[in-house]
């Protein structure tokens, strides 16, 4: 691995490095190596193994040893018997941060699992609540059915009472009509009773279903043929037939008496 150009220049000025590698032809941007924490001279003087360098830590002001291949560090020289290597503080912080992030993610995962388990436990609770609501709903429906049956029963009772009342009123009306029929003079028909009193007892309408006649009933009408039939008679026995003559009646009676004598 070639050394940096600035380091080769320093070593050449001090006489440590006699052969300078030619600079590359490509353009190189100037860099400031004054702040380089690697102490190359101390590294050369102490004779550190390959890939080990002595580095100055500006934060604490103390040197440490750094392996550029494994990226491990140590506060003691590799030649020291108490030499112990470890990761740098920066890497430890990063690893700790990664571990903390990982632990936080694990904790979040555990929390999510707990929440999921809680929700799974809540599901049976919700199912129980649903069952309770269904029971309450069935109870309410049963109560409504009972109330409906009670209302129907009350309506039936009211209907029966109405029927009984109507029957009592009908019986009362029948008894009232019977008393009126049995009474000699009805009191509820004054106008008709007056007409009935004026009715002639010999009028057929007073003792039969014949209609009541007027003053002109039975008088000969104009342009009416004189057939001798009784136009005032009604019913199936008469049918408006003319009366027989008196001689025909006498002859019929004589024939009837002869037939009786012969018998």
From Swiss-Prot:
InterPro entries reported in the protein's UniProt record: WW_dom, WW_dom_sf
> Which spans are transmembrane here?
none
Protein's GO biological process: activation of innate immune response; alternative mRNA splicing, via spliceosome; cellular response to exogenous dsRNA; defense response to virus; innate immune response; neuron projection development; positive regulation of defense response to virus by host; positive regulation of non-motile cilium assembly
What are the record's GO terms for cellular component?
centrosome; ciliary base; cytoplasm; cytoplasmic stress granule; neuronal ribonucleoprotein granule; nuclear body; nuclear speck; nucleus
The residues forming a coiled coil are: none
- Please provide the record's keywords in A-Z order: Immunity, Innate immunity, mRNA processing, mRNA splicing, Nucleus, Phosphoprotein, Repeat, Transcription, Transcription regulation
Q: List the GO molecular function terms.
A: double-stranded DNA binding; GTPase binding; ribonucleoprotein complex binding
Which residue ranges are recorded for the region named 6 X 2 AA tandem repeats of [DE]-R? 150-161
Q: Where is the composition biased (Basic and acidic residues)?
A: 99-173
Show the segment(s) annotated as Important for interaction with TXNL4A: 243-253
Q: Show where the WW domain sits.
A: 46-80
Where are the annotated segments for Disordered?
94-263
Domain of life, source organism: Eukaryota
Q: Where in the cell is it found?
A: Nucleus; Nucleus speckle; Cytoplasmic granule
Give the modified residues of type Phosphoserine.
245
- Region 3 X 2 AA tandem repeats of [DE]-R: what ranges? 139-144
Decide whether keyword Transcription regulation is in the record. yes
Q: In the UniProt record, does the keyword Phosphoprotein occur?
A: yes
Name of the protein in question: Polyglutamine-binding protein 1
- Taxonomic classification, please? Eukaryota, Metazoa, Chordata, Craniata, Vertebrata
């Amino acid at each position: 691995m070639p050394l940096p150009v600035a380091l080769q220049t320093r070593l050449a000025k001090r006489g440590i490095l006699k052969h300078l590698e030619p600079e590359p032809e490509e353009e190189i941007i100037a860099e400031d190596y004054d702040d380089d924490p690697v102490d190359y001279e101390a590294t050369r003087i102490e004779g550190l193994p390959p890939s080990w360098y002595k580095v100055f830590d500006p934060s604490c002001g103390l040197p440490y040893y750094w392996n550029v291949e494994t990226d491990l560090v140590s506060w003691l020289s590799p030649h020291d018997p108490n030499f112990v290597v470890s990761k740098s503080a920066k890497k430890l912080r990063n690893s700790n941060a990664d571990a903390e992030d990982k632990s936080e993610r694990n904790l979040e995962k555990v929390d999510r699992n707990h929440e999921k388990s809680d929700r799974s436990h809540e599901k049976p609770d919700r199912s129980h609540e649903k069952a309770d609501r269904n029971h309450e709903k069935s109870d309410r429906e049963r109560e409504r059915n009972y109330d409906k049956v009670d209302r129907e029963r009350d309506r039936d009772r009211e209907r029966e009472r109405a029927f009984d009342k109507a029957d009592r009123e009908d019986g009362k009306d029948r008894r009232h009509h019977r008393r009126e029929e049995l009474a000699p003079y009805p009191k509820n028909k004054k106008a008709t009773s007056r007409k009935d009193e004026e009715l002639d007892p010999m009028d057929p309408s007073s003792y039969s279903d014949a209609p009541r006649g007027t003053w002109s009933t039975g008088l000969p009408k104009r342009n009416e043929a004189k057939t001798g039939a009784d136009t005032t008679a009604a019913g199936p026995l008469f049918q408006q037939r003319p009366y027989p003559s008196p001689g025909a009646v006498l002859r019929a009676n004589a024939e009837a008496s002869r037939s009786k004598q012969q018998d």
